[in-house]
Amino acid sequence: MRVADFSFDLPDELIARYPMAQRNASRLLTLDGNSGALGDKQFTDLLEMINPGDLMVFNNTRVIPARMFGQKASGGKLEILVERMLDDKRILAHVRSSKSPKVDSLIHLDGGYQMKMVARHDTLFELELLSELTILEVLEAVGHMPLPPYIDRPDEDADKERYQTVYNQNPGAVAAPTAGLHFDDAMLDALKAKGVNIAFVTLHVGAGTFQPVRVDTIVEHKMHSEWANVPQDVVDLIAQTKAAGKRVVAVGTTSVRSLESAARASLGELKAFSGDTDIFIYPGYQFQVVDAMVTNFHLPESTLIMLVSAFAGFDHVMAAYQHAITQKYRFFSYGDAMFVTKKAH
């Protein structure tokens, strides 16, 4: 398939630049992967669609304030976007400046902190913090929330809370697992009260999630790598859920990719997994674990719309997106959501 097959025209006003006042006040488009049937709902209607005994799997990564500003030794301004933390002092990062910083040169960050340019790895720079503090402490002090480019505004104080799930736990993401943004504590409690089981995996979403696919045919695309962790207790819960004939519902494409990575690493049998994954899911992929998913509306030609198309059928998904545009759903990170069931192969 060609990347251009996943293109669609989106009116600019449908890109959500701010979240709804209440997390669960979004709309929800339901898509039956088998029939292609669509339903226009409210996000809170999801409670009626998840059955007792179903297992919902969430990504509990925490978004770090990954964008920093500073100056090179020459005085030229630069912007740093963390791609991943290598340890307490070192990061891999995207650096934007008029000229790339040289190896061994110093970078002066806002707030008086200093970093040293250690090495260059293709388009990424390895930087080392020269401080008693850790990278996380410096990011919390001077970093900005790394809002995606299409939100097209500076980050605000409110984004520190709203571009973060209520159940975030493990710092390391530079983009939010956005399907999870719709859930508040009351909704999670209501799901549990109904007898729905809740589990957490971790996938530290990288800035690569926003990189455009720069090839013509999707099989040529080289997927970026991200760190994921699927613990043994989640594997056990999934086995119990499947044995009882219930569904595994992944909240977000990152949860889908975590679970399917764990199955891929052990050749189809789900086992605990911790490490880097570059799994690229596109039409033709056979899902091993996930039966249904909650997901936001994704960018045209992105690897994420390809994943949803693999799950529910290309024609069904593209038709659903056209319906969403006609019905003026809000798109992307701060936008509305879909509840999608898997197409039988």
From Swiss-Prot:
Transfers and isomerizes the ribose moiety from AdoMet to the 7-aminomethyl group of 7-deazaguanine (preQ1-tRNA) to give epoxyqueuosine (oQ-tRNA). Its main location: cytoplasm. NCBIfam families: PRK00147.1 (NF001140), queA (TIGR00113). GO terms for biological process: queuosine biosynthetic process; tRNA wobble guanine modification. It is found in: Cytoplasm. Monomer. This is S-adenosylmethionine:tRNA ribosyltransferase-isomerase. Keywords: Cytoplasm, Queuosine biosynthesis, S-adenosyl-L-methionine, Transferase. It is an enzyme of class 2 (transferase). GO terms for molecular function: S-adenosylmethionine:tRNA ribosyltransferase-isomerase activity. The gene is queA. Its EC number is 2.4.99.17. Belongs to the QueA family. PANTHER family: S-ADENOSYLMETHIONINE:TRNA RIBOSYLTRANSFERASE-ISOMERASE. One of its GO terms (cellular component) is cytoplasm. The keyword S-adenosyl-L-methionine applies. Pathway: tRNA modification; tRNA-queuosine biosynthesis. It catalyses: 7-aminomethyl-7-carbaguanosine(34) in tRNA + S-adenosyl-L-methionine = epoxyqueuosine(34) in tRNA + adenine + L-methionine + 2 H(+). HAMAP family: QueA (MF_00113).
